[in-house]
Amino acid sequence: MIINDAIKKLALREELTEDEVRGVINQIMKGEATSSQIGGFLVGLRVNGETPRQILGAVKAIRDNGVKVEIENTEHLIDTCGTGGDGSKTFNISTAVAIVAASGGAKVAKHGNRAVSSKSGCADVLVELGINIDFDEIQSKKIIEENGMAFLFAPKYNGAMKNVSKERKELGIRTIFNLLGPLANPAPITGQLMGVYDGALLKDIGEVLLNLGLKRAMIVHGDDGLDEITITTSTSICEVKDGKIKNYKLDPEKLGFKKATLDDIKGGEAKENAEIIIKILKGERGPKRDIVVLNSGAALYVANLVDSIEDGIKKASELIDSRAAYKKYEELSSLQVIV
């Protein structure tokens, strides 16, 4: 299907199929659509409401055009990321979580970018932490397999996304592309901890991850708006496990955490956030550590390294207290040139 036909269907409130969306996104990724066509298509999808099958088709199209990180042993291979856009101004929680999870045996393919709506994106804080974000697919494969975590810089691996960057910026609204970054990991991950900016997305993203073949995944949305498992209130969770989906609430107090406020977990610029992460990895206690431990417990769970989130929380605490997590950070920051 060509993009003009898709726009006509959307204008008539007709639903596009997975294959139709995949075809149109492929056309866009190849630079074969005009700005007007791209804008019309994205707005049409948004107004009609993107379905799980349409999101799945778009993810497959991004992967069709991206660079792949070929990892044979996918056991314990995960990503920890969020859609962003929650406006919370927290520090880079999922980045700290990735390091803790890697220290506990997870293989983390951390897919991300620089800041869009926040002061500090994942790439920004990793640079401040001294962790190389520029490895290619061969180097990243080696690092993930041998050291447990590599950062897959989105523009390097999904460069064709640049074909919609201008239109997305000009539209100034959330589109299907706000969801695609966390879903289009270049590595064949089997587990994922993914935060979303809107609780209405939980079930749909759960269906997408199920259809992508993930063994374990948790899609999370704090009831305070956070795209993480929060410690200020409960969190709504959609869990994918063994081919099934279940939805539930998670209360931090029932897991042994003291409730905090959003101000307690606020961050700042990339340099400040890097300092926060290092302090946590060195054992500093408080709400910032608590939210990292809680989410790290979930990451270890989706990596299939523990049988429950409770066991994951216990293991994450031990990894920080034993300095294993900080040692993993030192190891990762020492990897500057890989041949």
Curated annotation (Swiss-Prot):
Keyword vocabulary terms for this entry: Amino-acid biosynthesis, Aromatic amino acid biosynthesis, Glycosyltransferase, Magnesium, Metal-binding, Transferase, Tryptophan biosynthesis
MF-aspect GO terms: anthranilate phosphoribosyltransferase activity; magnesium ion binding
Matches recorded under InterPro entries: Anthranilate_Pribosyl_Tfrase, Glycosyl_Trfase_fam3, Glycosyl_Trfase_fam3_N_dom, Glycosyl_Trfase_fam3_N_dom_sf, Nuc_phospho_transferase
Annotated residues for binding of Mg(2+) 2: D227, E228
UniProt pathway annotation: Amino-acid biosynthesis; L-tryptophan biosynthesis; L-tryptophan from chorismate: step 2/5
Cofactor or coenzyme needed: Mg(2+)
GO biological process: L-tryptophan biosynthetic process
NCBIfam families the record matches: trpD
The protein's name: Anthranilate phosphoribosyltransferase
Source organism of the structure: Clostridium beijerinckii (strain ATCC 51743 / NCIMB 8052)
